[in-house]
Amino acid sequence: SYAAQLRSLIGQPVGKILLAGDTSGRQVDLEEDAHLCRVQECPSGDVLMDSLLWGARDTGATVALSVGGTVRSPLHTGVVTMGDLLTTMPFDNTLVVGDLTGKQLLGALEHGASGYENGAGRFLQVAGLTYSVEPAKPVGQRVSAVSVRTKAGGWEPLRPEAVYRVATVDYAAEGGDGFAAFKKIKWQYTGRAHIECLRDYIAKAPVEVRSGGRIKVLR
């Protein structure tokens, strides 16, 4: 029956998630609460963004970003199933790629930080990029110290006039969560579902989570 097929798909092991340095093999949630992904870097967000960047690896994208509200439930260590992935990210989002100037990227990060005090879902989780956010500052002036990964693997400050190839999902690209500026960008639709990128990224090799260092919250 269809229900039985669905159950077997949901129970299908995909791969493993490991915490760097933890050899116990026990199953623990990557964060206490998915709501954390709306106010800080979170390990589940790191894995989701790394999978997005990995899914876009043949496009030349060097940065991935998407809204923290995408994380509906924490991922956990140990063996993860398709059902676990769908619980974490129960959305039909697809991967898109576009070219943004540094100025546009900064604008997106500022918009992401603009609803910080309300824990708004638009707060951006990232890969290939690091930034600081100071919630006490006025909206539009909260983001600083933005760095991007270079092709050589180092880091350099974001340059306003430089152009960066960015991977995100169609939801944000089409102006979801108030990202109206994204509607002006020419996005390339890959047709790849983010959930499939996540599945394949975890399936190819155990994912070792080393959280920290992407987003600094300044108090």
Mark where each language-model region is.
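Catalytic centers of hydrolytic enzymes
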Residues: 1-219
